[in-house]
Amino acid sequence: MVGSVLVQRMREERDFDQVEPVFFSTSQAGGKGPRIGRDVEPVKDARDIAALKALPVIISCQGGDYTSEIYPRLRQAGWQGYWIDAASALRMKDDAAIILDPVNMPKIEEALSTGIKNYIGGNCTVSLMLMAMAGLFQRDEIEWMTSMTYQAASGAGAAAMRDLVAQMARVGRSAEPLLEDPASVILDIDRAVTETLRSADLPKSNTEFPLAGSLLPWIDKDLGNGQSREEWKAQAEANKILGRNGNAIPMDGVCVRIGAMRCHSQALTIKLRRPLPMDEVEGMLADAHDWVKVVPNRREESLAELTPAAVTGKLSVPVGRLRKLPMGEGYLAAFTVGDQLLWGAAEPLRRMVRILVDAGVKR
């Protein structure tokens, strides 16, 4: 799914005019390549080390298992090219940079100048949070932060998105006769919905538990200390992206999966290092890069612009509900939404290709 979005974005931005693409698959070798506006060779076997080794740059959207299997074999075979990856397997390695160029372009340039060859997309929630709050992070105005997330089904993969839609359809069918009867009692509708969500045959082979009309208050592995791995990533990855490994900003929160398709939302509590007027906060956020949009903290604008329905498919990362909290002048609330498949996954990879092309890497 991330690979499909990546190809779509590369077509839109005419990136394929700058490179000579070769497409690989673990399951469809020999098949026809994607449409990119010109002819391409048939898809090759993604486990063919010799074919992979011939390339100066490899972009992987196949997942961590593939990376763990193929990447070390490539390096052992003497491959010296650039590895760009959406998976988490290499993110925290010392010889890898996490890429989010609107936020950390100086760190990417430093990595290139020191010979780093591995450029890895960050966790989707972390990347979207940093895109929204870059203006404060870049000026070192944040002392600590918490993020309470509302994460879309897409973060769990295409199969989870299918589960969600199938669950919604099943719930709709169960309630439809009662909904069409004006005399029906709402508690009867509620009972029908609840029975459907609790039924053993509800489609949930990938979500494990009901997601439609519900939520999942745990994402990723249990670290054994009450924290999920998804929650751990906030501090670990964000500080690496920002280049603050020796002076980390504390970050934590609770990560929750909700019944949205592909947009992650986050409610943030920020402790500032010093009191700042709200107009300065909003100005810093708005000036950070071209894709952040500060939404005025008013009801109509918030409901119109700060929802997954409004943001899906857009590169814009809106941030709003900005206000001081009663705990003190240095405490700030914010709410942000972003497309998990764009800045949360494919876009940093696409832009890294252009960075390498601009740096003179061979086609």
Positions of predicted regions on the chain:
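Glycine-rich beta-alpha junction loops
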Residues: S27-A29, C124-T125, T149-A156, P203-K204, ...
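C-terminal active-site/capping subdomain that shapes the small-molecule cofactor and substrate pocket
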Residues: G246-R363
